[in-house]
């Protein structure tokens, strides 16, 4: 079998189908675009829906992709099984009304078995087909040449989700050998498609040829489609001879780095620790890519999934003796593994690490206390008659210590306990009834609180006010009820006028304080949202009693507001600069304005070059340093458009709009807060540029003090590098590194030449011990080598030496067994086949292998069996000669 990296396998798949006329489609964002039915992109075909339903016609009806995907329906199994993951890649080839079975089945076989491609052993491949799908059976048996006993007919091989397109499918399985099975050889489930660990599904080909009608009938589709999916992690585990997906190069670097962070723990030392290592490796991949694509931890939807994954990883870090926040330290490892095809984690590394670290630090505050409480709760539940954790206890862990219910559920399962889920739900409902905020209703999909809808009082937002503002409190909402006084924990307030900006248009809300007439702090403003009737809703933590009708002093957090103003004006400059550098086809596709950074999404079919990024950054800073006044005009939409204002796609504008102008460089409709002059921004620095999805790019940038910090941090890094490479000045660093690289390459070349000489010398020693086995001469020995490549090189030396007819070389490498068998023409004519010999020997050292008649190789887990395996080969050589 070929030795391939995961990156090589991925690229090989795309190259194969590109050769067969397919358009290679970039992986879409994990966050579905225009598909509210999906929380995450969970398969390759999920991104093809628009093509298969006919809403969009593809440029090429043959498409291939490697699609990053997230599935979270069985998070609790991750780490406990060989194949479960939350984040995975799905390799796929798709036909939108183009080719069908007679093309796709031979292609699949060619890719899997051809030496040019994966080169898997055909004898180890099995397929399943739908019993009535005689066409697929014919293609596999009569065209591909698969034996009957390698084709299994299963009723389950029909893809149907109700009304709509459907059809039979064919799954391809790889036989990992009975030694890797978890059921007995005579078990009824021991077959391809059964519940067993021996036959690993690697590819599913769906033949979408019918339409399932509402009346239950199936009719032929006029245009037949192909949808296939191959799990990258699964096929890589086969190629890299890994027991599970986690021992591949997609996970092991993360696991090795986690070992360094742990309290002396080592992977493969015990089962419990292995589960923790696997959970951490999987979850950091998922959260890194999800954050890169725009998801952030929160208490709902995708954000809740991220929060759960991060906290589950942190809990397992504790089990490995890791103290404090650590998951963010693994992000660079994820980026390095995946950068060849997915550069976004490397591009957004600092931001991803910041998000994860902040989330970890929030959880770490209560983690230790929460774990102690959990241990006590479990101990008490074990003493109870019903062995059940009460809903009240589970809710306390959730509400006070931030333990998602699912984590407590997993801990209970591991301890052999149950949880009173009904009791937990009742506690959750009671809490919502006690302290539910109107904000929760506003932020849910399309729902608006009845109480807020009935508030008609006018409230005016004053843009320019940053100093203290006196205002009358006209409405108080507590627990979804209008009240005259607030003396509790939380409240929602409406004033007759306010300087607090409510979140809108990508700009987050102002924070600040509310004082009484005596200058005493009565409330902290933690968020501001728009009410149904457009008043600004101030969500506050109540410090002292608040009364309706009283005058209060409203103080905006000026530092936060300044950061928001600077970054919002900077997004306008950035938008204009992108359109000037990339072209006017570039449009804003989304934005986020925070006090300490900005995120700007824009339409673009291609990544920006380094030169383009530098040009955009330079242009923005030139406009900042030109000290241009920022002018705002309130007018009607038509007048605004005549002024040249850009209207954002998908935005709805009322009768009155606000136009923000920066000379003739930028004119946009915008309701956000802005600088009075561009020079207040100071400077802008682009931190990263990456893909969000097909046709959308994302820039993350910082301004002012954050930009200065970003530059100085990198200057410090450059100085460290300068010192490390002993460069006289910073300008010499690149040349110095190039010189070091040249020296390193020269040293590596010398080392390789020396190694070749050593191997040649070893070959001379090994090849002098020649045995006569009937009519054939045999060299059979265990070699002292560093790797499988050295073993193969010795075999190559043997070919040119003409020392014997048969070569059997074995070696122990890194605790694993390896064997190579080579035959000359005389041995082959005598009836021997290297592949047959290796298959006989491999089980003795706990492995498997295969190859061609003249050369074969195998690997295994038990080096102690190599001596007996060599003896077995010699016996076979004697018995199998004609």
Swiss-Prot record:
Name of the protein: Alanine--tRNA ligase
GO biological process: alanyl-tRNA aminoacylation
SUPFAM superfamilies on file: Class II aaRS and biotin synthetases (SSF55681), Putative anticodon-binding domain of alanyl-tRNA synthetase (AlaRS) (SSF101353), ThrRS/AlaRS common domain (SSF55186), Translation proteins (SSF50447)
InterPro entries found in the cross-reference section: aa-tRNA-synth_II/BPL/LPL, Ala-tRNA-lgiase_IIc, Ala-tRNA-ligase_IIc_anticod-bd, Ala-tRNA-synth_IIc_core, Ala-tRNA-synth_IIc_N, Ala-tRNA_ligase, Ala_tRNA_ligase_euk/bac, DHHA1_dom
Protein's cellular compartments: Cytoplasm
Catalytic reactions on record: tRNA(Ala) + L-alanine + ATP = L-alanyl-tRNA(Ala) + AMP + diphosphate
Matching PANTHER family: ALANINE--TRNA LIGASE, CYTOPLASMIC (PTHR11777:SF9), ALANYL-TRNA SYNTHETASE (PTHR11777)
Highest classification ranks of the organism: Bacteria, Bacillati, Bacillota, Bacilli, Lactobacillales
PROSITE patterns tied to this protein: AA_TRNA_LIGASE_II_ALA
Main location: cytoplasm
């Amino acid at each position: 079998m070929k030795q391939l990296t995961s990156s090589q396998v991925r690229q090989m798949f795309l190259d194969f189908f590109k050769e067969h006329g397919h358009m290679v489609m970039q992986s879409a964002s994990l966050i579905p675009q225009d598909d509210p039915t999906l929380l995450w992109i969970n398969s390759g075909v999920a991104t093809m829906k628009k093509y298969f339903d006919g809403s969009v016609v593809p440029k090429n009806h043959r498409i291939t992709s490697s699609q990053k995907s997230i599935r979270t329906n069985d998070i609790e199994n991750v780490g406990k099984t060989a194949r479960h993951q939350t984040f995975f890649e799905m390799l796929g080839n798709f036909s939108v009304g183009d080719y069908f079975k007679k093309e796709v089945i031979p292609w699949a076989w060619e890719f899997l078995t051809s030496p040019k491609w994966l080169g898997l052993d055909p004898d180890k491949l099995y397929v399943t087909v739908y019993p009535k799908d005689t066409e697929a059976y014919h293609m596999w048996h009569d065209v591909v040449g698969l034996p009957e006993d390698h084709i299994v007919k299963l009723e389950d091989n029909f893809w149907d989700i109700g009304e709509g397109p459907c059809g039979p499918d064919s799954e391809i399985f790889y036989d990992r050998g009975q030694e890797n099975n978890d059921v007995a050889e005579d078990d009824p489930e021991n077959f391809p498609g059964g519940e067993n660990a021996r036959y690993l599904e690697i590819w599913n080909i769906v033949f979408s040829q019918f339409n399932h009608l509402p009346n239950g009938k199936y009719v032929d589709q006029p245009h037949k489609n192909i949808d296939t999916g191959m799990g990258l992690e699964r096929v890589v585990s086969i190629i890299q001879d890994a027991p599970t997906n986690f021992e591949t190069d997609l996970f092991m670097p993360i696991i090795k780095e986690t070992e360094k962070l742990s309290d002396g723990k080592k992977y493969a030392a015990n089962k419990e620790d292995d589960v923790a290592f696997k959970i951490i490796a999987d979850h950091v991949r998922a959260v890194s890519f999800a954050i890169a694509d725009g998801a952030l931890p929160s208490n709902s939807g995708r954000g809740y999934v991220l929060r759960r994954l991060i906290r589950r990883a942190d809990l397992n870090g504790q089990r490995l003796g890791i103290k404090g926040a650590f998951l963010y330290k693994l992000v660079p490892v994820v980026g390095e593994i995946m950068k060849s095809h997915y550069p976004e984690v490397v591009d957004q590394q600092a931001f991803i690490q910041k998000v994860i670290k902040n989330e970890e630090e929030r959880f770490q505050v209560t983690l230790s206390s929460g774990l102690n409480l959990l241990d006590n709760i479990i101990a008490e539940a074990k003493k109870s008659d019903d062995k059940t954790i009460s809903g009240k206890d589970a809710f306390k862990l959730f509400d006070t210590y931030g333990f998602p219910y699912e984590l407590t559920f997993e801990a209970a399962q591991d301890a052999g306990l149950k949880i009173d889920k009904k009791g937990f739900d009742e506690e959750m409902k009671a809490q919502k009834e006690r302290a539910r905020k109107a904000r929760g209703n506003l932020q849910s999909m399309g729902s608006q609180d009845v109480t807020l809808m009935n508030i008609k009082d006018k409230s005016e937002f004053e843009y320019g006010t940053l100093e203290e503002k006196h205002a009358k409190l006209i409405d108080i909402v507590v627990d979804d009820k209008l009240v005259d006084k607030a003396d509790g924990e939380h409240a929602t307030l409406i004033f007759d006028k306010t300087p607090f900006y409510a979140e809108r248009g990508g700009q987050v809300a102002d924070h600040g304080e509310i004082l009484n007439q005596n200058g005493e702090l009565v409330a902290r403003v933690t968020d501001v949202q728009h009410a149904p009737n457009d008043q600004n809703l101030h969500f506050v933590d109540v410090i002292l009693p608040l009364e309706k009708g009283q005058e209060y002093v409203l103080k905006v957090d000026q530092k936060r507001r300044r950061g928001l103003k600077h970054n919002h004006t900077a997004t306008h400059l950035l938008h204009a600069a992108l359109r000037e550098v990339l072209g006017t086809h570039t449009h804003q596709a989304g934005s986020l304005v925070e006090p300490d950074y900005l995120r700007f999404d824009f339409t673009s079919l291609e990544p920006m070059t380094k030169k383009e990024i530098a040009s955009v950054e330079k242009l923005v800073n030139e406009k900042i340093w030109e000290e241009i006044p920022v002018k705002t005009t309130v007018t009607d939409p038509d007048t605004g458009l005549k002024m040249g204002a850009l209207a954002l796609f998908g935005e709805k504008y009322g009768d009155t709009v606000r136009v923000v102008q920066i000379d003739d460089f930028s004119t946009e409709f915008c309701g956000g807060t802005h600088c009075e002059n561009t020079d207040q921004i100071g400077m802008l620095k682009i931190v990263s540029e990456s893909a969000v999805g097909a046709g959308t790019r994302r820039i993350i940038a910082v301004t002012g003090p954050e930009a200065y910090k970003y530059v100085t941090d990198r200057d410090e890094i450059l100085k460290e590098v300068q010192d490390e490479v002993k460069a006289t000045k910073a300008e010499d660093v690149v040349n110095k590194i190039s010189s070091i690289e040249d020296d390193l390459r020269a040293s590596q070349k010398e080392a390789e030449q020396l190694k070749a000489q050593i191997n040649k010398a070893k070959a001379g020693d090994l090849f002098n011990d020649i045995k006569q086995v009937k009519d054939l001469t045999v060299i059979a020995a265990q070699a002292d080598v560093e790797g499988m490549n050295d073993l193969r090189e010795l075999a190559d030396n043997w070919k040119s030496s003409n020392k014997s007819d048969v070569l059997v070389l074995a070696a122990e490498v890194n605790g694993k067994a390896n064997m190579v068998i080579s035959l000359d023409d005389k041995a082959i004519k005598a009836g021997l086949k290297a592949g047959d010999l290796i298959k006989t020997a491999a089980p003795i050292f706990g492995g498997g292998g295969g190859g061609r008649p003249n050369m074969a190789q195998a690997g295994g887990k038990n080096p102690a069996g190599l001596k007996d395996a060599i003896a077995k080969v010699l016996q076979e050589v004697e018995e199998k000669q004609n």
